[in-house]
C-alpha cells in the first residue's frame, strides 16, 4: 500500500511538471497576487517530495535527500559549475558573437526563479523519479536514461519553438544531474549544477535569450 501511494504521488509530480507553465500563469492567480501561482507550485513539489520520503522505507536515502558522500559532493559541484560556465560562454559567442549579460534590473527576479526552479525540478526528476525507478529495480544506466528523457519531454515548449540546442541540452542536463546524484548519493550537487547552468546563461547570454517572467 505504501509503495502504491508513493507511485501515485510520483506520477502526480511528473504530471504537475508537465502542466507547470499553465499552473503558474493561471488567470486564477494573476487576478489576485501574481507570485502566488509559482509559490503554490513550488510548495506542492516540496510537500509531495517530503510525503514520498516519509512513506518509503528509508525514504531519505532512497530519494537522495541526504548530504551524500563528502569526498565527492564538492568536486562534482565544482565540475558542474565550470562546465555550465564554459557552455554558456560558448553559446554566447557562437550564437550572438559576444557576451551579453542579463540587464541588472532583471537579475533579482531571475535569481530567485532560477533557484526555486532548480530545487523543484531536481526534487521531481533526480530525487523522486530517479529514486523510484531505482527502487523499482531498474538498472542505474536505464534509470538515468529514462529520467533524462522524461525531463526533456517536460520541456516540450522548446520542441514547439524549435530550440534544438536547449532541447538537447535539457536531456543532457537531466542525465548529467542524474549521474551526479547517483555518484554522490545526494541530490544537492544536481540542484547546485542546475542553478549554475541557468545563471550562467543569464550571465553570458541573458540579454539576447528570450526571457519570460518566472
Please state what every model-predicted region is.
Residues 41, 47, 72, 77-79, ...:
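Intrinsic disorder/low-structure terminal segments
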Residues 2-13, 76-82, 132-146, 179:
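Structural signature of hydrophobic alpha-helical transmembrane segments
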Residues 89-93, 103-214:
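Transmembrane helix-loop-helix hairpins at the membrane interface
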Residues 25-36, 53-123, 130-131, 135-136, ...:
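Juxtamembrane helix-loop-helix connectors linking adjacent transmembrane helices
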Residues 1-65, 142, 202-214:
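N-terminal, membrane-interfacial amphipathic/helix-forming hydrophobic leader that caps
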